[in-house]
């Protein structure tokens, strides 16, 4: 299976598509999140939120083969948002 096939399956609600997308990207995206947040538990939380965002917005993905890079941007943005929230709570 490739990303184009997996995205098509996921868009159709087929768990095999979601599974492929998750299994082939989890490890690298976990380490990406960890680089930002510096905490394993927080990195897992970031990933959970990022995958939910990505999977609910698959229709916005113009090129399915670009899924790993697209997801990477979502992970990075989610991690940055988490850091901003933590900083704002620390200020008050």
Specify the residue positions occupied by each region the protein language model found.
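A short, charge-rich alpha-helical start-of-domain segment used by transcription regulators
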Residues: 7-31
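A short, glycine- and basic residue-enriched loop/turn
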Residues: 15, 40, 44, 58-64, ...
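Intrinsic, short, N-terminal disordered tails of RNA polymerase sigma-factor systems
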Residues: 1-5
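Structural recognition of an alpha-helix C-terminal capping motif at a helix-to-coil junction
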Residues: 31, 45-52, 56, 65-77
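Arg/Lys-rich amphipathic alpha helix in sigma70-family domain 2
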Residues: 59-63, 76-92
